[in-house]
Amino acid sequence: MDRGMILDIPAWVCRSPRGRVATGINSYEEAVQGTYINNDYFMSNRNGNCKFLNVLQGENHAEADDWYSRMKKYCDPKQYDMPFEGWAMGGQNMCDIHLILRRLVELRHDGLLEKGLHDWMHFLGTSKLEWATLLTDIQRAVRKYHNENFTISFDCASPFLASANGQIYIQTEITDREKWVYRMVPSVDDKKYATDTRRFGDAVLQDKVFESFTESPISRRIEIKDICIYAPGDLNKIGKEGRTSWDSFSYAIQMGHNVWSHLNAVQEANRQYDQGIVPKMLVQETFDRVYFKDVVEAIFATSDKGEALAIIEDFSKFWIQIIGTRGAIGKKTVNASAMFSNLFEEEVDEADNHHQDDSGLDDTKLDELEQAE
């Protein structure tokens, strides 16, 4: 393994009934202390074969700042002979561009974004297509002005959640000054296709199952009967006739198609962005036309920390329109969320913290698929 994350305990688990049962964590402070224990174990037992990413958590700006101030030592070569080699952004750090930019400036001036030491930053659960271009802008700016090796990566479960929920990617929609999406729709599931030898893409378009369909290398090589396996009267592997025409491999094939489609969408989004096609959320046209990439360039072009932070604050209204995966942004996370957390105890399900671009996806379906195997 080249890189991996340490075993953090996210701040949100204390507000989740299932999270509390699974971890025994009942407060933010307990999550911090538990992460200390795990970080210390990783630090004491590592052999250097894997570069570890220090995970930053926190559900609002106040918690995120506190978490960073307490956990940043694990990446500090002045404190450890073999410090962690990069960062992973969780909680509010993964979806709030205001917080992300401020954290990057602090990392730079704390000496914790250095070439050869802290070359990698990973964003957890990042599913919005616009963020593929936004993170590219940040990576380019950091490489240009500070660390030429700096690399950003991100993950999301959308392709797998889509399949588990019976959905398939059919097209990518990239239009200038509009919302960018990879379109998911309910996939074909009909026992009448169990002996149909037409190619999958041909069948779904000829029969108007989908209005459009962008092929993948996988979909080009399958027939529709490879997805709709069971005919009327066929028994499944537990000896019963089910309602679906799919077997477990039907899900696997479509997951492969969805993964390719998602990766292709990310690549195409960056290609179009470099040609001047811009998503609505990354340009501010209320008064003067302001592009996200130009503001990011200005933030990292200056070597003065105070000036960089001032630029970030000057564009605080711009950041509010840039919506992250979880949707909580701007002043609500700086003020209202922090105050609410201080005054009330709220119970949430952890699924809410892995909210995908398609809000209808149910992440428990993946568990059901695994248990069915």
Regions found by a protein language model. Name each.
Residues 26, 38-39, 45-49, 54, ...:
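Detector for Asparagine
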Residues 13-19, 189-373:
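C-terminal extensions of enzymes
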Residues 28-31, 35, 64-71, 100, ...:
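Generic structural signal of hydrophobic/aromatic residues within well-ordered alpha-helices
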Residues 1-6, 39-49, 76-82, 353-373:
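Intrinsic structural disorder
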Residues 47-217:
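Glycine-rich phosphate/ribose-binding loops and adjacent secondary-structure elements
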Residues 1-61:
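Active-site beta->alpha loop and helix N-cap motifs at the rims of alpha/beta catalytic domains
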Residues 24, 79, 111, 116, ...:
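Short, flexible coil/linker elements and helix-boundary hinge sites characteristic
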